[in-house]
């Protein structure tokens, strides 16, 4: 892969903060200054809210030692389903140096909240998909695919499965940064260790598992209640690649009386849609990829090199150059702000202690957590008054389009006038007990914009 932009990055380097505090020190790791400014640790100033979800909210922050902007993810300490520390642990397990992973600068308490400070990244693939009129060219999809196979291979090499594939969880770097053409993977709130840390053996095959992930992209076996493994992450990627090429998937827009029935319909439609039909009018390699990953055994290690080569050879055969000139290059990318992007995806989720929510219908007015309707492009945050995106790193585990929202916190806490770190949550939708779901209008960790109301726009 040739991440084109090798020119010198004239922006300050990512914040090299003090060693990450785990929140177990007796020394307070947050304070409020005399001017009422909230701090996380000794050097991270908490700014305005730029995202929210059932976990809590995401804030823009600044490292006062380096003047670098960061993302600060907040989760109420008394959350009924805390996951931020687990996500932090997974980030540490993945390491801070791998390409395409956000840096984690700090974890510790912040008043009534736990806080995780992360690198700021650019917009998600879903936002860029919107920007490109909801279709990507084959060249762009292949450049994305080759990178994401490598990202998933790396995650798997650290004994983790991701379980939350959706365009909202893959972000480019910030404009003008040397990482701007690299596709990053974020939000490990639904990740799971597939190698038992005690026995060092693969987790056992199980059935009758709750759905975990995003219904639009999840594997067929996940719909069937089978325990997920490496194969399921790769199948979900394949569904996402076809979503980008086609503009929609055959199982979008299905109606049902209950969420459980709807997820059942989505799974049934996936099973009944032949790969040849799903990939019709596109290169055979797309179908070959899906056939391969769907045939993998639960315990089997995928041949990542084979899959990368499949797409790399197609890329070369088409005469493309890996110049990182994606479809969105040259288009005006909006300045980041505090608007909330809502998605039309369908999520059915639980993960032991995590539940997910389903989006409201597109005819239902979607509002951000302040009750003000969101508008596409309503970016009221100027980072240093520069026109580069500074969307926060991990779309909070509860985020938008594909909608896998773990119900991390259900505090529904309202902010007091002087409380700069309140969390909010959405009211749960009643669903069958086997599938915990909550209504989804989730917001990304970075930003969520209300989509254009295209009449042809794809539905859940």
From Swiss-Prot:
Pfam families: CK1gamma_C, Pkinase
EC number: 2.7.11.1
GO biological processes: endocytosis; positive regulation of canonical Wnt signaling pathway; signal transduction; Wnt signaling pathway
Binding of ATP, residues: 50-58, 73
InterPro entries per UniProt: Casein_kinase-1_gamma_C, CK1_Ser-Thr_kinase, Kinase-like_dom_sf, Prot_kinase_dom, Protein_kinase_ATP_BS, Ser/Thr_kinase_AS
Domain Protein kinase: 44-315
The protein's name in its UniProt record: Casein kinase I isoform gamma-1
Gene that this sequence comes from: csnk1g1
């Amino acid at each position: 892969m040739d991440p084109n932009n090798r020119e010198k990055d004239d922006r300050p380097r990512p914040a090299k903060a003090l060693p990450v505090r785990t929140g177990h020190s007796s020394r307070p790791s947050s304070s409020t200054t005399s001017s009422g400014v909230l701090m996380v640790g000794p050097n991270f100033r908490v700014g305005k809210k730029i995202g929210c979800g059932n976990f809590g909210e995401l804030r823009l922050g600044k490292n006062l030692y380096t003047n670098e902007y960061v993302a600060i993810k907040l989760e109420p300490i008394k959350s009924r389903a805390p996951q931020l520390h687990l996500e932090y642990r997974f980030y540490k397990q993945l390491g801070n140096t791998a390409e395409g992973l956000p840096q984690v600068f700090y974890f510790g308490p912040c008043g009534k909240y736990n806080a995780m400070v992360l690198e700021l990244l650019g917009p998600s693939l879903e936002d860029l998909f919107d920007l490109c009129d909801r279709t990507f060219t084959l060249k762009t999809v292949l450049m994305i695919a080759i990178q994401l196979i490598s990202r998933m291979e790396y995650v798997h090499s650290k004994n983790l499965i991701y379980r939350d594939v959706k365009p909202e969880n893959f972000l480019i770097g910030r404009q003008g940064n040397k990482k701007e053409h690299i596709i990053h993977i974020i939000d490990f709130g639904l990740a799971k260790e597939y190698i038992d840390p005690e026995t060092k053996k693969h987790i056992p095959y199980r059935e009758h598992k709750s759905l975990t992930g995003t219904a639009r992209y999840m594997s067929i076996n996940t719909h069937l209640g089978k325990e997920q493994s490496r194969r399921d992450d790769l199948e979900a990627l394949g569904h996402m690649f076809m979503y980008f090429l086609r503009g929609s998937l055959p199982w979008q827009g299905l109606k049902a009386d209950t969420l459980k029935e709807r997820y059942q319909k989505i799974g049934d439609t996936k099973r009944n849609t032949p790969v040849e039909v799903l990939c019709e009018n596109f290169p055979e390699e797309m179908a070959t990829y899906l056939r391969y990953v769907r045939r993998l055994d639960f315990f089997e290690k995928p041949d990542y090199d084979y899959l990368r080569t499949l797409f790399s050879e197609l890329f070369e055969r088409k005469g493309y150059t890996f110049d990182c000139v994606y479809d969105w290059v040259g288009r005006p990318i909006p300045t980041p702000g505090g608007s909330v992007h809502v998605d039309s995806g369908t999520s059915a989720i639980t993960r032991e202690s995590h539940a997910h929510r389903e989006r409201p219908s597109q005819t239902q007015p979607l509002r951000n957590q302040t009750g003000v309707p969101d508008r596409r492009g309503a970016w009221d945050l100027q980072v240093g008054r520069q026109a580069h995106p500074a969307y926060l790193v991990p779309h909070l585990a509860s985020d938008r389009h594909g909608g896998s929202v773990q119900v991390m916190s259900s505090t529904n806490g309202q902010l007091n006038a002087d409380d700069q770190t309140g969390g909010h949550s959405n009211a749960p939708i009643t669903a069958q007990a086997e599938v915990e779901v909550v209504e989804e209008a989730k917001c990304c960790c970075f930003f969520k914009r209300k989509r254009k109301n295209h009449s042809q726009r794809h539905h859940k």
